[in-house]
């Protein structure tokens, strides 16, 4: 399979996941008024979030042609989906459209931890990659101090 086909396949996967996230958020925002949602819809959104995440992991682990996502694409997709779902759920509770039951509280607590892990992973792995690149470039281009001294 050519590189263009792999790139277009990864673009398709990213667009599908982004589209599902946008559709869910739009449904939350505009169904019967701002942030009107019931418990069944929240359960459906949780299932879609988990299915999207597991689909990405499945593609990468089994090295399907669609599974040639690079680190940046995986990191970006997971960060977008988790952040959108976390802030969507949090805003529904804060607006009062979603009743804060024990189950919803546990979901928000779990999403809070997932959000913190994703943010730490996203920025931490970028920092490590940048540090490794700068170290590698410094090793490849050593400065010749002997030539300057002579």
From Swiss-Prot:
One of its GO terms (cellular component) is plasma membrane. Its main location: membrane. It is a multi-pass membrane protein. Keywords: Cell membrane, Membrane, Transmembrane, Transmembrane helix. It is found in: Cell membrane. The chain crosses the membrane at residues 12-30, 40-62, 74-96, 106-128. This is Uncharacterized protein AF_0523.
